[in-house]
Design a protein with these regions (language model features):
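Polyanion-binding surface elements
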Residues: 1-20
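Class I S-adenosyl-L-methionine
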Residues: 122-132, 142-329
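Short helix-start
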Residues: 7-8, 30-56
Length: 345
């Protein structure tokens, strides 16, 4: 619609979240904002109101500097890895190509170590030294939604740019961690992982893959593969290394580990505490636009929902055969967050 922006476009323009834009619209704080076919539209020349929930002060930002070890953070996104490893690893350099994710990252954390730009333009010789190098490289070409084009395709193939940067560093990190979807191990009879494993071995690292699903920690399913590599000149403590497969290894990892040179069977204690239930952690007073939500629900799913007196179901969009579709779960587990174009978020 000429002269108007969507909620998402307005959020990107103002550097806030789409949810914040929706709240401002519902509170009538954006002059000229209106609903057309149950969807908010905002005048392109509308002034940005003051947003009380913006993160813009040093007092609200997370300080990641107090940690005994340092890390590089490739494909950093909004900084979930940095947050997860806080207290143990402090990022000295982080990178992503997405401007909106960069805005969120910088709003969340103190210190200016984030470099916005294409990894193809990164030169390893310019990076500070670090103990750990983390790369959550793109998953699209290793997932079903991306038709499993493979590790040499355009998106997932950016892992080779990561290794090129690693080759250029003046001092290689002693530990590498690469994260991706289960297709890294499963697709193409494991050839994707075999190529990556060989590349890491050529660079002087012993490595192994583990498979974790977040549902053992919380009520959300997010199956992921973590490839952990340690340089050959580092002595690996026996406490974290097994002699055979364990609960961290799915069938694909077991099959690969039994045939590959330099494979490490990583070991860790298995969580024994049951995760919190979905119902116990839901925010019952969350602000949302009921019309916008119901607009996404097809009639066949509404019929199923209406068959319950009261139900908590999680829904997310997935791309199958090139088309978006809504999927619901009724088992108390949330599925992976999904991007509209496919792949996990």
């Amino acid at each position: 619609m000429q002269g108007y922006l969507s909620v998402q476009e307005t959020a990107a323009k103002w550097g806030i979240t789409p949810r914040q834009v929706q709240i401002l619209c519902k509170e009538n704080r954006i002059v000229g904002a209106s609903k057309i076919s149950k969807v908010w539209v905002i005048p392109s020349d509308a002034d940005k109101p003051t947003v009380s929930c913006e993160v813009d002060s040093a007092e609200t930002k997370v300080d990641l500097s107090h940690a005994p070890y340092t890390m590089h953070e490739f494909f950093a996104g909004s900084g979930l890895v940095a947050y997860g490893l806080k207290g143990m690893f402090s990022p000295v350099w982080s990178n992503d190509i997405n401007e909106r994710k960069a805005t969120v990252y910088r709003a969340n954390f103190l210190h200016d170590h984030f470099v916005l730009g294409d990894i193809k333009d990164v030169r390893g010789s310019e990076l500070p030294t670090a103990h750990l190098s983390w790369a959550s490289f793109p998953c699209q070409d290793l997932s079903l939604a991306g038709n499993m084009k493979g590790i040499f395709a355009d998106r997932s193939g950016l892992v080779w740019e990561y290794l090129r940067v690693l080759d250029e560093t003046l001092e290689k990190p002693k530990i590498l961690a690469l994260e991706n979807v289960s297709g890294l191990l499963v697709a193409n009879n494991g050839e994707n992982y075999k190529n990556l494993h060989e590349a890491l071995r050529q660079r002087g690292y012993r490595c192994g893959a583990i498979f974790l699903n977040s549902e053992i920690f919380l009520p959300q399913s997010r199956p992921r593969v973590f490839v952990i590599a340690v340089h050959d000149d580092v002595i690996i403590p026996e406490e974290i290394m097994d002699k055979e497969p364990n609960w961290l290894h799915n069938k694909a990892a077991v099959a690969l580990g039994k045939t590959l040179d330099g494979w490490v069977w990583w070991k860790a204690p298995k969580p024994v505490k049951a995760p919190a239930t979905l119902e116990s952690i839901l925010d019952q007073n969350a602000v949302f636009d009921k019309d916008d939500v119901l607009r996404l629900v097809p009639q066949r799913i509404m019929d199923e929902l209406n068959s319950y007196e009261s139900v908590i179901a999680t829904g997310y969009r997935r791309t199958r055969n090139g088309h978006q579709q809504l999927e619901l779960r009724f088992d108390g587990i949330a599925g992976c967050l999904r991007t509209p174009a496919g792949g996990s978020s």
